Swiss-Prot record:
GO terms for biological process: glycerophospholipid biosynthetic process. It is a multi-pass membrane protein. This is Digeranylgeranylglyceryl phosphate synthase. GO terms for molecular function: geranylgeranylglycerol-phosphate geranylgeranyltransferase activity; magnesium ion binding. GO terms for cellular component: plasma membrane. It is found in: Cell membrane. It comes from Metallosphaera sedula (strain ATCC 51363 / DSM 5348 / JCM 9185 / NBRC 15509 / TH2). Disulfide bonds: none annotated. Belongs to the UbiA prenyltransferase family. DGGGP synthase subfamily. The chain crosses the membrane at residues 10-30, 37-57, 76-98, 102-119, 126-146, 217-237, 260-280. Its EC number is 2.5.1.42. HAMAP family: DGGGP_synth.
Length: 284
């Protein structure tokens, strides 16, 4: 893979862009303004790419030991280039957000600042770092909805934003459990290293169960039957994550499952937002 694509974690960038797309179509019910949608996806993708790059900048010393094949420690990308690229990407994203409005600009700016502080200070603070990542990820969908910003957009977007927050929070806690031994050796404070694996698992499971129990709610708030159809595999995969073994190995399995849950969640809200007249038009 190209070292710059690896540096920005291109798969995460694509996921963030899809989040913005989902947020826009969910809040607008597919009443798409192509310019606003493209800007929303670009802003979110650029800010996410910059945040991922700055994360590697501040992790360079740890990566020299744990992940020497990452672009900076391997020498494929210099530290100076990576730093300039990260700030440049976030800067372009923030500038583009100003074209959409002051609220969009404010969200993009604050998210960029939060990602910098996360990489520099908050990543090793345990639950606080997890909360920052979960909030930033949920804001991808929120930003998409904000880019539409008409009618009852907020009523339609708050549930997918909340579910994204809870799923991401669970995944970040589970990732801390998976990395327990390495984090303990490197004095990294995570929920698992400070409170124990069992306690960390308990918090992650509570967040997932809240998501599962309330997941039918969108069907009563205007989302169509396609949401319910996609909800079935979502619940199956998420339940498997909840029931994973309370161990580092179980955490590794759960983290992979939760990536699938996140993707299915976006699909559910995107398809569930299609207006009925659109669905009936394509029925035989």
């Amino acid at each position: 893979m190209n070292p710059f694509l690896k540096l920005v974690r291109i798969h995460n960038v694509i996921g963030a862009g899809l989040g913005a797309f989902t947020g826009y179509v969910a809040s607008s019910m597919w009443k798409i303004d192509p310019t606003e949608l493209i800007l929303a996806v670009l802003v979110v993708a650029l800010v996410d790419a910059g945040g991922n790059a700055i994360n590697d900048v501040y992790d360079v010393e740890i990566d020299r030991i744990n992940k020497p094949d990452r672009p900076i420690p391997s020498g494929a990308v210099s530290l100076r280039t990576a730093t300039s690229l990260s700030y440049g990407l976030m800067g372009v994203g923030v500038i583009l957000s100003a074209l959409q409005g002051y609220l969009q600009f404010l969200v993009a700016l604050l998210t960029s600042v939060a990602l910098i502080f996360y990489a520099r200070d908050l990543k090793r603070t345990g639950i606080y770092g997890n909360l920052v990542v979960a909030t930033a990820t949920a804001l991808s969908l929120f930003y998409g909805g904000l880019s539409y910003h008409e009618g009852d957009w907020l009523q339609r977007i708050w549930i997918p934003v909340l579910y994204t927050f809870l799923l991401t929070l669970s995944r970040e806690i589970v990732k801390g459990i998976e990395d327990y031994r390495g984090d303990l050796a490197n004095h990294v404070n995570t929920l698992a290293t400070t409170r124990g694996i069992a306690s960390a698992w308990r918090v992650a499971r509570v967040a997932l169960i809240i998501t599962e129990v309330t997941s039918p709610l969108p069907l009563f708030l205007g989302y169509n039957i396609l949401y319910g159809i996609v909800l079935v595999p979502f619940l199956y995969i998420t339940t498997k994550a909840v029931l994973a073994e309370t161990s580092e190995e179980g955490a590794s399995k759960a983290r992979s499952l939760l990536k699938g849950s996140a993707f299915l969640g976006m699909v559910a809200f995107a398809l569930g937002s299609l207006p009925f007249q659109f669905l009936f038009h394509y029925l035989p």
